[in-house]
């Protein structure tokens, strides 16, 4: 870190898990006990695909989900430590996480490329127009009105034109990549281009093989192609690299808070 000219952070689900955001543990079971009893859901991820029979049930669940994962948690200690660790270094973040933790911890929104969306936004269900709608006000409005795992019909969210909405989470080809998404994609590429022949430090946190083409494989290619680049991989389960020609590589399988603190 001390020697690096640029720092590029790549973060997957393992980082938020290491930070203590547990989407299947006791906290989840307490907050979602009505849904667990009624629908048999077991965790926040798989319950996202539950086939609710009515829109009132579906959006009651999503209001609770969004609040639990996006608005209730403050910036975790681990994310704040990462921000302090980077300090004043020229840096950028690419992440598949959708929980907003980087921005909460003090990273500039202009330096974050959240490729897979953000819990904080709705989009048109059809994918058109390419616009997003912030949902915090809606969540705060409907949460107190959930009864029997339903919301009032009149509070089902819609676009300003009255059309159906979906979460802005990448799950199929209707995912909306709006103007901000494309600006951040360009900023990410520009950062890589200016750092490629300098001392670039790649910090990869908790990235597995769910979507390796977004962070894991590109980071390995950069480490192999850019001679002054060092890849540091923090991954308990998959610390190895598969790309040949990487000159500078370190991996850590220990608990991430322990590594950062030391």
Regions found by a protein language model. Give the residues of each.
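Conserved catalytic alpha/beta core of Sir2/sirtuin-type deacylases, generalized to analogous enzyme cores
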Residues: 1-262
